[in-house]
Amino acid sequence: MSTNNSDIRVVVGMSGGVDSSVTAHILKEQGYDVIGIFMKNWDDTDEFGVCTATEDYDDVIRVANQIGIPYYAVNFEKEYWDKVFTYFLEEYKLGRTPNPDVMCNKEIKFKAFLEHAESLGADYVATGHYAQVKKIGDEIELLRGVDNNKDQTYFLNQLSQDQLKKVMFPLGGMEKTEVREIATKAGLATANKKDSTGICFIGERNFKQFLSEYLPAQPGEMRTLDGEVLGKHDGLMYYTIGQRHGLGIGGDGEPWFVVGKDLKANVLFVEQGFHHESLYSDSLIATDISFTTNAEKPKTFECTAKFRYRQTDTKVTVHLRSDGTAEVVFADPVRAITPGQAVVFYDGDICLGGGTIDTVWKNEAKLDYVG
């Protein structure tokens, strides 16, 4: 049932998955002038020598032909390497745990891809993200997707007004089950394709093995904060704050967890117990602060925040500092705050923006062992 949208061109980022397939299908049904673009961001083959990107592009072709839209593949490998993968490696060198999805959305999907789409005459770009945009006056608000389990605003926190004004998220008002139902009803080739998980350029491969191809591993000591040596680690880059698995520490009592790293001494700090006090902090300093609206922000404001994907919101007070960083003070102590990850601010369902966790604090003292 077409409406009068035929003079509005929407370029859809199609990954070969069910979400972007349904996105393209919905927009086509609504009468838009739809073009599908497959972004080739990584030159990759799996352990069987099969290029997973080729398989995904084949699915894009099948779906595009089914719904009757033109499609193209565009190579963003250089941009992805320069803007996302280089950043990913640099963060790991610093002992941090980066979030490449945030950078990919900021630099590739809603920058390089958006610019390419505009060269094709696009009025908007659309993706299969579970998020919503809403026009309020001259501003576009970024809102959580209605499916709490799939909401992806955490990864979109760095988008600007200029980017949001050009974006459509047709799946934002739906549950994942509805999306699958639409795909099945429409007979789309990707209706039963399983969702991709993990970091796109690692895919199904072993994370340690992948990282060691780019960064040399430097094994070292595993110690408690009091200095007791408990074993060896395989390389600091393989561990993240709060991690339990892969430590290889036996014995009685509660499990052991990563609580910090000393990059200079190449030491991994571990402590026993999920709720060990060294895992908790009450504030952080964040860099790369970005807001989704242009509205003037007070120097201090209260909101809620997420410190990792799918985490429950925490009440916080944000103090914007003159050097462009922000101090984020938690209403209650939070476990396993991890440098390199995103801190994302919310006002109800509105995603206000966010930044990158830089340092972690407790009782107004920096926790040097965290990083």
UniProtKB/Swiss-Prot annotation:
The keyword Magnesium does not apply. One of its GO terms (cellular component) is cytoplasm. Its EC number is 2.8.1.13. GO terms for biological process: tRNA wobble position uridine thiolation. The keyword Disulfide bond applies. Residues 150-152, 308-309 are annotated as: Interaction with tRNA. GO terms for molecular function: ATP binding; tRNA binding; tRNA-uridine 2-sulfurtransferase activity. Residues 99-101 are annotated as: Interaction with target base in tRNA. It comes from the Bacteria. ATP binds at G13, M14, S15, G16, G17, V18, D19, S20, M39, G128. It is found in: Cytoplasm. CDD domains: MnmA_TRMU-like (cd01998). The record marks H129, Q341 as: Interaction with tRNA. The active site is at C104, C200. It is an enzyme of class 2 (transferase). Belongs to the MnmA/TRMU family. This is tRNA-specific 2-thiouridylase MnmA.
